[in-house]
Amino acid sequence: MRSSWRTIVAGLVLALGAAVSALVPPAHAAGITIAIDPGHGGSDPGAVANGLREKDLTLAVSLALKEELESYDGVRVVMTRTTDTRPSENTSTDLSRRVEMAAAEDADALVSIHFNSGAPIAKGAEVWYPNSSSYNYGTHTQGRTLSNAIQKQLTGLGLADRGIKTRDNPYYDYPDGSTGDYYAIIRQAREENMTGVI
């Protein structure tokens, strides 16, 4: 079981690396900064199944992804965590802290790595990106492009295509009155005018 996970992790790293590097336009090759966020960590294990903890998988994939991305010219990578910790042990501020860290490094995009839990029959890959609200609209278009590239690479590995998705938050509006994004990491990155994807 663990050796198959290693194979999957290696494939994911190469797929994500190819997707992100494909988005570095020649004019931007002088420098693009990608923030990688290994989901969960510390006291928050995330999903747990078959002796595996999401926080461990997200960290392993993220560290390998960092190494892969740094092999491309013009790509700088920053991490929200590099060990089994959380940027903030306070649950209510943890996601905000992750976005703040990426924004402080002037990241062009924040990629939050997760492995969802679900029924044993659930499988495949999906990518969440900013909705089509007018607020900082460029994060939507860049997020859609990045999500499509990531999803194409992941499904190319043979993972079932669960699609690229957006989700509205019916209880939150952006400052311009447009509908907010549901996921905090995407919403808060957008408020920093930074593309966030999960």
Regions found by a protein language model. Name each.
Residues 10-22:
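Bacterial N-terminal signal peptides
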Residues 142-167:
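Acidic, glycine-rich loop-and-strand cores that form catalytic or ligand-binding grooves
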Residues 1-12:
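Bacterial N-terminal signal peptides that target proteins for export
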Residues 19-32:
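Sec-dependent signal peptide cleavage junction
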